[in-house]
């Protein structure tokens, strides 16, 4: 049983060695150090599928672009909502300041009105 596991391990090492040899030959072909006939013997590019041509990558890319667009729009809406909340708070502070200022003015007007009424009552009582 241990012999079969060693065979599997040595088989993997042999395959890695073959891939290394093929890769080295391809590198030599790229440098034009090998004859032209050997260029087509060990082409890994033909055996390994291109990751960009797998079916569904277009949909996946479109999905991620759509997701990115939705996240960007939602982030913009959140910032807009925060901006509106801050603006509303500032306007409420302005209104409350005006109301307190007008309240003081109204109190002053009431005092002046009371003084005028008292003075008119005094003048009316003096005339009678």
Curated annotation (Swiss-Prot):
Entry-annotated residues carrying Phosphoserine: 24
Cell compartments where the protein resides: Membrane
A cellular component annotation (GO) from this entry: membrane
Keyword terms: Coiled coil, Membrane, Phosphoprotein, Transmembrane, Transmembrane helix
Annotated transmembrane regions: 66-86
Any coiled-coil regions, as ranges: 90-111
InterPro entries: DUF4577
Claim: Chloroplast is one of the keywords in the record: no
Topology of this chain in the membrane: Single-pass membrane protein
Entry protein name: Leucine-rich single-pass membrane protein 1
